[in-house]
UniProtKB/Swiss-Prot annotation:
Signal peptide (from-to): none
Upper lineage: Bacteria, Pseudomonadati, Pseudomonadota, Alphaproteobacteria, Hyphomicrobiales
Function statement: Required for the first step of histidine biosynthesis. May allow the feedback regulation of ATP phosphoribosyltransferase activity by histidine.
UniProt KW keywords: Amino-acid biosynthesis, Cytoplasm, Histidine biosynthesis
Species for this entry: Sinorhizobium fredii (strain NBRC 101917 / NGR234)
Name of the protein in question: ATP phosphoribosyltransferase regulatory subunit
Record-stated family: Belongs to the class-II aminoacyl-tRNA synthetase family. HisZ subfamily.
């Protein structure tokens, strides 16, 4: 489909992508909706334009390129490593601006040098933006979900709580809300008198007794287990909810998590600060910090200006498929994010790839870049 109303710099941008040794690909505008609904995150899900096929399949207008490019890679059985570039329209419901706009970017699939590929993604994004905005100083914000995951695991949180906190990564208000719940958990009574009675009797602490009690209750009330979940499913779900609601994190562990989330410093200073924090807090997060250190060193090797990059421990991006590095780039004086990206090592497996394929990439918002160029007096 021919692209119309492209920004004037689009041709130069594609030339940059070619020089970066990428393969340009396109994907259909109409996409299966399920992958986006399952993996893209709540912020994007509520902006998707949904439709339906004649056979009742849920479809949507392409809201981003990462998932479609990964699906294309799987369908064509292309080998890795492979670097894809794209430029095309995406469609999202937005409060301001057009609901259809251009994005471009690079998806780097299959490179097993995680630190090197991460650094290349950041360096490439900075380079193509600098080529459009030569007179504007860039600002890069970098986070790392894998370090965050290592910290909360080392604090000894139950698996259910770890999942909730990971899901909230990048949402400061939600993270603070969850930390507040960990500081002041609920009592069993908030689930109702019957659950409180079971807790007092000790039945909640014994899964077999709880399953038997639920089975007897369901049989006595004529509730069909065939029409819903089994007593064991209900028991496990209830215990999970109770664990989430009643888990208390001690003050020392809460202080450790809050100290970690407060980190906001130049990237060059971050490795030493994180190692000192881990040592002081007695956290065993060596593997996550080793990768972090390697990435910082690799960023310096690709020539990215490290003084433009800040590390924020609480920084994440509103897409559920990220697993490690996350970053966004702005231009000083332009409040909008011009580029964003990160690592998504689990995505291709979730989409159906037969083998594990590590991946990292970034997207550019061309309408925002165009406005930034105009504001700077460019052409």
């Amino acid at each position: 489909m021919p692209l119309i109303n492209l920004p004037a710099f689009a041709g130069d941008l594609l030339a940059d992508f070619e020089r970066l040794k990428t393969l340009r690909v396109d994907t259909p505008v109409i996409q299966p909706a399920e992958p986006f609904l399952d993996m893209a995150g709540e912020d994007l899900r509520r902006r998707i334009f949904m439709t339906q096929s004649e056979t009742g399949d849920s479809l949507c207008l392409r809201p981003e390129f990462t998932i479609p490019v990964c699906l294309r890679h799987i369908e064509t059985a292309t080998g890795t490593p492979q670097r894809y570039a794209y430029l095309g329209e995406v469609f999202r419901q937005r409060r301001e601006g057009s609901s259809e706009f251009y994005q471009a970017g690079i998806e780097d699939l299959g490179d097993t040098d995680t630190a090197g590929a991460d650094a290349r993604a950041i360096g490439d994004a900075m380079r193509v933006l600098s080529n459009r905005l030569a007179n504007r100083r860039l600002k890069v914000t970098l986070g790392d979900q894998s370090v965050f995951e290592a910290v909360i695991a080392a604090c000894g949180l139950p698996g259910g709580w770890q999942k909730r906190l990971i899901h909230a990564f990048g949402d400061p208000k939600q993270l603070q809300k969850l930390l507040g719940e960990l500081a002041d958990p609920k009592s069993p009574g908030v689930f109702g008198h019957e659950v409180e009675r079971l807790a007092i009797l000790g039945i909640l602490d014994d899964e077999e007794r709880l399953v038997a009690h639920l089975a007897e209750t369901m049989e006595a009330t004529g509730y069909s287990t065939n029409a819903s979940r089994s007593p064991r499913d209900i028991a496990r779900r209830l215990k999970e909810k109770m664990e989430l609601a009643t888990t208390r994190l001690d003050r020392a562990a809460l202080a450790v998590m809050r100290e970690f989330l407060a980190f906001d410093l130049p990237l060059s200073e971050a490795p030493a600060a994180l190692h000192a924090f881990a040592k002081k807090s007695r956290l065993k997060i060596d593997d996550a910090l080793s990768l972090f250190d390697a990435r910082v060193a690799a960023i310096a090797k690709v020539g990215a200006e490290s003084d433009l990059i800040r590390y924020r421990a609480a920084f994440g991006r509103p897409l559920d498929y990220y697993t490690g590095l996350v970053f966004e780039i702005e231009a000083e004086g332009a409040p909008a994010v011009l580029a964003g990206g990160g690592r998504f090592d689990r995505l291709l497996t979730l989409l159906g790839a037969r083998e594990h394929i590590p991946a990292v990439g970034f997207s550019l918002w061309l309408d925002r870049i165009e406005r930034a160029i105009a504001a700077a007096g460019g052409a």
